[in-house]
């Protein structure tokens, strides 16, 4: 029997208003659906931002949280691929974690490494109904590069 999804790592950039809004939306949906989740946007470290110590602490925390998660839900903005999010998706896939790639819009080009390396491809609004128990695999139907 496969392990039930209970704890989710919510990957995605949060560098502008749209990304923050979408992250907040995903957090609300996951909370409403009863999942425990780790959202890097909500977690800080003690080191001074911009220092190597800060970088090392963020990296260690996020890597540990990916290990602790049952799955990764990644907010993806197509051609604009946040390097941190891409790393988190690749790392999660490499250690056998399901990766649910959540496309923030239907117009952007998508990177083949992210769409093919993910368990499934859904859109932001699909988070409300996606079946995390059976993890159906949906192929990406949009433009890709």
PLM region spans:
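Conserved catalytic or regulatory cores that recognize and/or transform ribose-phosphate-containing ligands
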Residues: 1-145
């Amino acid at each position: 029997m496969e392990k039930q999804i209970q704890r989710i790592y919510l990957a995605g950039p949060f560098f502008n208003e749209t990304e923050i809004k979408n992250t907040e939306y995903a957090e609300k949906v996951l909370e409403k659906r009863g999942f425990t989740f780790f959202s890097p946007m909500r977690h800080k470290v003690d080191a001074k931002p911009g220092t190597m110590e800060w970088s090392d602490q963020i990296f260690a925390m996020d890597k540990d949280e990916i290990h602790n998660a049952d799955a990764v839900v990644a907010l993806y903005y197509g051609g604009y691929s946040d390097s941190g999010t891409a790393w988190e998706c690749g790392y999660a896939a490499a250690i056998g974690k399901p990766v649910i790639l959540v496309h923030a819009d239907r117009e952007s080009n998508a990177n083949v490494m992210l769409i093919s390396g993910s368990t499934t491809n859904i859109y932001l609004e699909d988070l409300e109904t996606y079946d995390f128990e059976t993890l159906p695999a949906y192929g990406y139907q949009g433009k890709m590069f």
